[in-house]
């Protein structure tokens, strides 16, 4: 409806079929031969494939961090109007980050616009503050299409019933179990929480968290494992609140907070200077607590469990905030306007 035709270029270890039709546009895939530090690297055919697509496009839209895209950006075909969405600083790979710095500086400097996903990240990212001019730097929040209304879940298939949570309040943690998610703090907070905590997802920290629960002798932490899309929405619709206790800036935004807001659920997140505190407003849509502070985290969870009226009011305001700032349509209109602004008329 906005009159923009899109093509997406990406890498995959198994890039067959090479082209996929999606609602957003055609997805074109080349082979990823290696992924050091979670950075997929392509071969000569990737450069050829990108060259063809870049020559077709009027505007190139890059995403950061992906160092292979910096290599694509030096190709002659990339000398076009271009923008970059800056998702996150490089947090963990500091040594590699120093080696990558000159190429990163060149890439950021070559962009007509660099988009931070929240005002907080634009203000607190040292890279954005040092390497991106005020004229280049824009803010467009990430958005998400509304997943509601959803079909009712049959009782026989209910994950809430299967986990034994039908008649009790619970706090939901949803997503991949990664080191920066602060889930060890959430488990520690469970010692002081008057309700059940559900960890829905799988990932590298699974065994560490299970061992921590066993070591502490906790009976109010439930591991749901990886859940389906329908199960995810059932858990979101039935939980008291969503907790995202990420303690490192690798959690640059927190899309799961938007999913909770869609379901009119309050949120609990940590003050880490990123987009999480832009989505979740302290004392309005939920609570923002200090990172790595299990007592404060437990206090916030207990307050929402004990006060259903406050929890529902915060959840209602979270839904309103989603509708005002974070829908997919709002994001699309913002990027369409940006593309127009960098394109010669």
Stretch-by-stretch model annotation:
Residues 2-40:
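N-terminal strand-loop element at the rim of the active site
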Residues 62-69:
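Short His-centered aromatic/hydrophobic patch
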Residues 169-192, 204-210, 295, 329, ...:
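A conserved mid-protein helix/loop that constitutes part of the nucleotide-sugar donor-binding site
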Residues 207-230:
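Nucleotide-activated donor-binding/catalytic signature segment of Leloir-type glycosyltransferases, i.e.
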Residues 262, 266-270:
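Short hydrophobic beta-strand element within catalytic cores of glycosyltransferases
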């Amino acid at each position: 409806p906005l009159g923009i035709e899109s093509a997406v270029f990406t890498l995959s270890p198994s890039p067959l079929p090479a082209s996929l039709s999606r609602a957003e546009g055609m997805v074109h895939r080349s082979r990823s031969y290696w992924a050091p530090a979670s950075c997929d690297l392509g071969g000569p055919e990737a450069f050829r494939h990108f060259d063809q697509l870049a020559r077709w496009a009027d505007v190139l839209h890059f995403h950061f961090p992906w160092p292979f895209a910096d290599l694509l950006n030096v190709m002659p075909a990339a000398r076009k109007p271009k923008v970059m969405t800056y998702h996150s600083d490089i947090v963990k790979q500091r040594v590699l980050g120093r080696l990558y710095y000159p190429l990163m500086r060149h890439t950021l400097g070559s962009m007509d616009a660099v988009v931070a996903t929240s005002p907080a990240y634009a203000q607190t990212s040292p890279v954005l503050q040092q390497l991106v001019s005020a004229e280049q730097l824009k803010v467009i929040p990430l958005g998400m299409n509304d997943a509601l209304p959803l079909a009712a879940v049959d009782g026989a298939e209910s994950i809430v019933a299967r986990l034994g949570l039908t008649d009790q309040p619970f706090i939901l943690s949803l997503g991949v179990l990664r080191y920066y998610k602060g889930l060890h703090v959430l488990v520690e907070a469970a010692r002081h929480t008057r309700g059940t905590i559900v960890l829905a997802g799988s990932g590298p920290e699974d065994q560490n968290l299970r061992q921590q629960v066993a070591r502490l002798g906790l009976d109010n932490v439930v591991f749901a494992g990886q859940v389906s899309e329908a199960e995810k929405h059932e858990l979101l619709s039935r939980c008291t609140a969503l907790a995202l206790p990420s303690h490192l800036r690798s959690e640059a935004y927190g899309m799961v907070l938007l999913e909770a807001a869609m379901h009119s659920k309050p949120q609990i997140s940590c003050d880490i200077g990123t987009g999480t505190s832009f989505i979740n407003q302290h004392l309005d849509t939920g609570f923002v607590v200090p990172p790595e502070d299990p007592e404060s985290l437990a206090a916030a969870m207990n307050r929402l469990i004990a006060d259903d009226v406050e929890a529902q009011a915060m959840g209602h305001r979270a839904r309103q905030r989603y509708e005002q700032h974070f829908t997919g349509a709002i994001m699309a209109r913002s990027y369409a306007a940006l593309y127009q602004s960098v394109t010669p008329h």
